[in-house]
Amino acid sequence: MTDSSGVARWPTVPVTFAGIVLTLLAAAQLDGLQLNGDLYGLLGDDDPAVMTFRDLAKVTTGLEELLVVCDPDQHMPRDDIRRIESLPEIRAHTRTYIHPGKSSLYAFSLTGDAADYRHAGIVVKQVAPILSAMTSTCGMAGTPAYIVETHDNLNRDLITALVVALVLVTLLFAFVYRIGWLAFAMFIPVALGIEWGLAAYSLVRPELTLFAAAVPTLLIGIGIDHCIHMIQACRYSIVRDGLSRDDAVLSAWWRLLRPITVASLTTVATFCALAASELRGFADLGIAGAFVSTGVYVACITLLPAILLACPERWLSGKAAFDMPLRALAGWIEKSGRSIAVAAIAITAIATYAAGNLDVLSDIRKLESTDIQSRILQTRIAEEYGLSASPILIRFDDSDDAIEFMADIDRPESVANLFDVTDIKGLVQVHPVANPFIRSNFEAVTWDLERQIERLELGAWTLSGAPALNARIDELLFADIRFVLPLAAGLILLVLAFGTHSIGLPFVVLLPLVLSLIWVAGAMSMTGVPASVVTAAIIPLVLGIGVDGGVHLSAAWHRHNGDLTAVFAETGLAIVVTIATSIAAFGAFIVATSPSLVQFGAQAAGALLGCLIVTLLLLPVILRHRLTAEASRGQ
């Protein structure tokens, strides 16, 4: 079949065959991909702070122990202690704390890495039935139990969010276009593209860290954007131009190839900027996002036309909701352009002032779930025995230095207690008075410790522990923000300049998105929501994803010579639905139990909602002003 313009028939058979082969290869490659739910996995095993902690763990039996905690005045039978101690993954029963009126504590060191989910998971699964068969009420705490529980909760949250995103996107599309089956058809290239991208990612990284694990859910909303624009363009060609289904599909493909490619490249560019981060969590998010975005793009431009050509024509020619209201909106925008611009400037000024007082969350533990049983038990132990749940660790090369350090009577006021670790020479636990996971508190206590060590003229020492890892994440976070944001913006501008063949238009398209981010920062400040590592992750994502609507709007603006009614008739509904699906994909994380995922979803959804508003209302005003200015210069 050849259309009136001489466009050749779509190669459905070879494209479908290639897709099947690639899908089978990807499925085989994905078999070894693991999920890493450890929050400190955001640093990566090659980070100096992690390497120090791991090296300390190798020479320190029981540094990361499995703790069995029994209710006050309840004890663990000696036979059950021996049963746990005899497990192949348990190295030794290292210590026991039993005090009247307090919880009984039994510590077991592991033969492998206690922070490795695969090893810790085996241990926890073996110990769980032993504890459930006891008459005493006991539970597990410590690093192994926490890692397993966090991992399982994360896995459950991601599956739940994925299902919710699928349902929301399907319902949204079915409601707007009134054809549910077409929504399911759209998911085929998106799902295959996600699989291809994850398979490519697994060739580079063996595991998905906390942020990278959210990519499949995000790309449902992002990837389906291409499908929606293609379907809307087909509807426009059938209804307005009178083309047949086959001609409409091929015409839409050629007409949208450039804007879809540019929009995809802006998303890939954003993820590439994140991939350059020093923080492993951001880098993994960037690598996974770049691969998956590319996979979804390739699947959509190759497989989607074949799917649409197989659909009944009535699926593409029916009426859609909100078509007429959007066309009416175009007339209102034309009349109210100055008022819209004034309102945008006023909102931006207020938001900028409020954003100047935005707090930053330095206690990364507040991004973790508080209802995790292992963490509850760990906190109870700390309160009952007067110990910090996560002390700072100091390892002196000379064990005599550790003895002198602990014997010093002029202890800093920021330090509550000092304890040595049984049978580990030179290792001291520092229990601060204030929460060491808050940046200012950690810096204060470490400064006091350094002054104390200098005053005593002690030898070489190493600082480690969970608070030190938290401080390292904090340090890299602020460094990456200053680097990633300008890089992402620069790459997006380059892509837009290449795709639009203009130098000024990319700044016009990107400006409303910057305003949207300022509005969100101002809203967070006014509502008391602090910025965090999560906020830093969504900013470049919103720039790369939110710009897609502006790309399609500016392309349609050029095709229709600034006729806003015609622009909205062709692509206005698609812009609304695509950004709405992205909002639904991010918003699906709000149902998660993990505060980090909830914040990730809520903040990104709010920013994209701002993108939708400025793209529909403000961007046409800016484009109209730019067109008028160019006409004036021409005269």
What are these language model-derived features?
Residues D71-P72:
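Generic low-complexity, intrinsically disordered segments
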